[in-house]
A protein has these predicted regions:
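Extended, folded cores of ATP/NTP-driven motor/assembly subunits in large transport
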Residues: 1-421
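P-loop NTPase motor domains
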Residues: 66, 73-92, 99, 103, ...
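Conserved lysine of the Walker
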Residues: 466
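Hydrophobic positions on the alpha1 helix immediately C-terminal to the Walker A/P-loop
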Residues: 469
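Post-Walker A helix-loop "phosphate-sensing" segment adjacent to the P-loop in P-loop NTPases
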Residues: 476-486
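A short helix-turn-beta junction within AAA+ P-loop NTPase domains corresponding to the substrate/partner-engaging
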Residues: 502-506, 716-729
Length: 800
């Protein structure tokens, strides 16, 4: 063991904490027994090994959930079989315990995760409104409970020195077994194990856990003194008190001939604090087979005795008691399972600890748990005068003091599948709200920046809530983070939100006085190429849209354009002042000066965009593109200009992203009606480039579209799907559903969440996690009024 380093000097705060712990440690009851005396372990080490008794040592692994209930039958079978193999790993030398803790969290814990702190600016009223909405959504779900799952395993050893290498080997094997199941798991260290015990013992107070290893030596206290409750009271045989909390432990009598995989899930769905503990002990295979054979011999002997009686009494010897016949056939089936079907024998103790603030509520909680057991033909029976032993057996320590065991085979034990549904509730400072988990009613709060690839797609039929979902994320992001936001808005839907957030709406149209110069050059435009090379590539794409027919630009034409681009920027590169920035007309004039007839052809094609009626892009930029939130409204650009407009906007986005990258700032780019970009080869290629390269530049693009088929129109465009780890999928049309199911590996059951689903309902793909969500945003809010795109609601707003 590594010695724990101690601080040379304790701070005043440390001393205060130690004094408080000493005061608590000195409390005893009338018999001189302290609460610490009831806690059944001897020593906890910093690496997480705990000595329970002279020769028994344990470690604890915390594991996360996976989507079992949402999986289709083949996947459920695969998970179940994987869990059977997991259980079969444990031999008779390893005792293990599965602990499921549903403990009430303090309101502060969640309030800190969801509240948006005021900034004393013009947006505080919206921040307050958004926080209130999140608090209301939280109240509807059962996020008041923190649900955790643990596997504690223990071995017998003569000393910590002998126990440690064996425990570490078993720990590695268990973590690998979890990995095979696709379950995230990690080992708890000593402080984390103490924190969990403290949480169980202090359900009434929800006090913060304060403890450091270097407090032990100067205080003379043990680890128990920092976790023990104010008191334990086990006066009555049927319940107990722990501090101000009432509790009772029951054991599950398994009476059903067949068990259901929903039993454990239903217990864990209860909306009150409870602990479910399963102590499992593998029986040595040789011993198990011998025991069953002995039982079969006993049954056969009884059968012969009954047959002899029948002969003597003069009736048919085949008529024997039905129980005897049933037990005989069941015992033979069990022997066959153990010998030839990869089944092992386990002894299971299944305990349920219910808690409440008063005896009446405790009775209600126990009744509810009992009803769940009865639903599955089992019985929940209160422990009589064993409440203390029951409570201590429910702690994730790996100690079972209740000797009520039921023998089960591997597959019968595995039916208590410890997986239900994944949760997505991240506590990070930039975790945004995406709705409520449709399976558990818990908030979905995630930070896209934590994904390997934060690129995203919002997909759905018209009216399913695509634009609204994008606006909600934009508002949340604006209020909570410092990210810049750029929107490409082909339908003029985002202006009310952008204006309320004091952003800049740039309306680009032939009649507008808002101008953007497509020739704008940022000298940081590229990381690995010269800015001019990348700009030349953009202008080639622009000219290809303008000039190129079906075959695009010819090699000679490309050479001429590249030559002119390098010439047109000479003045600006020598003296980079805004007034020296070239415009499209400067390029046009240079082309006119070239000798080749191809140059004249290109210049003629450009003429309408320079001196003709479509000259909206032949001006120096005169709008503030440095605002934190910028919306490019291109609705009024005609058919000819819209494609060019979208390409120019994408180039502006590159400019902004490169500036922000130098400032270590993220840029979020929202592309509504994204299918319009994918129809043209040039804009599609540029979009694919954004999806490939944005991440390392600090960019987070989000495509919003109803046309899934356009996303899969070519192998090149398919890269957008492959490079999007975030997909917010709303209601889908029949044909699109099948395409998406194949592309994203969605099960039939999961597809039901995007089939004829209501507005704001669907599936969220976050990395490898898939969750069904519901987002019903309150309509009586200012944010809803500025985000809605429903014509009747917009008309109502205008009438007001």
């Amino acid at each position: 063991m590594q010695p724990v380093k101690t601080k040379k000097k304790l701070s005043r705060a440390d001393k205060k904490q130690i004094e408080a712990a000493i005061a608590r440690a000195n409390r005893t009851d009338k018999k001189g027994k302290s609460a610490q005396d009831s806690i059944p372990y001897e020593r906890m080490w910093p690496d997480g090994i705990c000595r329970i008794s002279d020769s028994h040592y344990t470690k604890t692994i915390q594991f996360q959930d996976i989507n079992y209930q949402l999986s289709q039958n083949e996947d459920k079978t695969a998970i179940f079989e994987g869990w059977c193999d997991f259980l079969n790993y444990f031999d008779s030398s390893i005792h293990f315990q599965l602990s499921f803790l549903n403990l009430a969290a303090s309101e502060e814990t969640f309030a800190n995760s969801i509240s948006i702190p005021p900034q004393r600016d013009a947006f505080d009223s919206i921040r307050e409104e958004y926080t209130t909405m999140l608090q209301n959504q939280l109240a509807r779900g059962n996020n008041g409970l923190i649900k955790t799952k643990y596997l504690t395993f223990g071995i017998d050893a003569d000393s910590i020195k002998a126990a440690k290498p064996r425990l570490e080997r078993i720990e590695t094997d268990i973590l690998n077994n979890f990995k095979r199941l696709g379950v995230a798991a990690r080992t708890l260290d000593g402080k984390e194990r103490l924190f969990q015990l403290h949480a169980v013992f202090h359900m009434d107070e929800q006090l913060p856990f304060q403890f450091e290893w270097d407090w032990l030596a100067p205080s003379g206290l043990s680890t128990k003194d920092f976790i023990a409750p104010s008191s334990f009271e086990f006066r009555t045989g049927k319940q107990f008190r722990m501090g101000k909390k009432y509790g009772a432990v029951s054991f599950l009598q398994i009476l059903a001939p067949e068990l259901n995989d929903r039993l454990l899930a239903d217990f864990l769905d209860m909306e009150s604090s409870l602990i479910v503990s399963m102590h499992i002990q593998s029986v040595d295979q040789v011993k198990a087979i011998k025991t069953v054979k002995r039982k079969i011999t006993d049954l056969d002997r009884s059968k012969i005795e009954e047959q002899k009686k029948a002969v003597r009494a003069g009736y048919d010897m085949d008529i024997i008691p039905s129980d005897l016949a049933t037990y005989g056939s069941e015992a033979k089936k069990l022997l066959q399972d153990l010998q030839s079907r990869n089944e092992r024998m386990f002894l299971l103790t299944f305990l349920v600890l219910n808690t409440a603030d008063n005896p009446r509520q405790l009775g209600n909680n126990i009744f509810q748990a009992g009803s769940i057991a009865q639903k599955y033909n089992c019985q929940l029976t209160r422990l009589d005068f064993q409440q203390e032993e029951g409570l201590m057996s429910c702690l994730p320590l790996g100690l079972n003091q209740i000797e009520i065991q039921r023998g089960l085979t591997t597959s019968s034990t595995a039916i208590f599948v410890p997986f239900t549904t994944q949760e997505l509730f991240q506590n990070g400072k930039e975790a945004l709200y995406y709705g409520i988990n449709a399976l558990s009613n818990n908030l979905i709060m995630v930070d896209r920046k934590l994904l390997k690839n934060p690129n995203g797609l919002i997909l759905g039929t018209p009216g399913s809530g695509k634009s609204f979902s994008a606006k909600r994320e934009i508002a949340n992001c604006f209020l909570l983070t410092s990210d810049d936001v750029i929107i490409c808005d082909p339908e003029a839907e985002y202006a009310p939100l952008v204006e309320r957030l004091h952003g800049q709406v740039i309306k680009i149209s032939p009649t507008s006085t808002n101008y953007i110069n497509p020739m704008d050059l940022n000298l940081d435009y590229s990381d690995d190429e010269s800015p001019l090379s990348l700009k030349s590539d953009f202008i080639l794409s622009l000219c290809e849209l303008i000039v190129g027919g079906k075959e695009g630009l010819q090699p000679v034409q490309k050479t001429i354009i590249d030559r002119c681009v390098r010439l047109v920027y000479q003045t600006y590169l020598n003296d980079p002042r805004p007034e020296n920035m070239p415009v499209l007309e400067d390029l046009y004039n240079l082309l006119r000066e070239q000798e080749e007839k191809e140059a004249q052809y290109i210049a003629t094609a450009l003429e309408i965009y320079v001196t003709g009626s479509l000259n909206v892009f032949n001006h120096q930029s005169n709008v503030d593109i440095n605002n934190r939130i910028v919306c490019y409204d291109i609705k009024e650009l005609g058919k000819q200009l819209k494609k060019i407009g979208m390409l120019v906007v994408q180039d502006q986005v590159w400019n902004r992203v490169t500036i922000n990258r130098a400032a270590h700032k993220s840029t979020r780019y929202y592309i509504d009606e994204m299918h319009l970009l994918l129809k043209e080869e040039q804009t599609a290629a540029y979009t694919v480039e954004i999806w490939k390269r944005f991440r390392k530049w600090g960019g987070i693009p989000t495509g919003i579209t109803q046309n899934v088929k356009d996303l899969l129109s070519s192998r090149e465009v398919e890269h957008i799907f492959e490079n999007s780890d975030f997909v917010y999928m709303l209601n889908q049309a029949g044909g699109d559903r099948q395409i998406l199911a194949k592309q994203l590996g969605i099960s039939t059951h999961q597809l039901s969440y995007v089939t004829h689903s209501g507005e704001g309902e669907g599936l969220l793909f976050y990395g490898s996690t898939i969750l069904p969500f519901v987002d019903h945003f309150p309509k009586n809010t200012e944010l809803y009024r500025i985000m809605t795109t429903k014509p009747q609601e917009l008309k109502k707003k205008e009438d007001e």
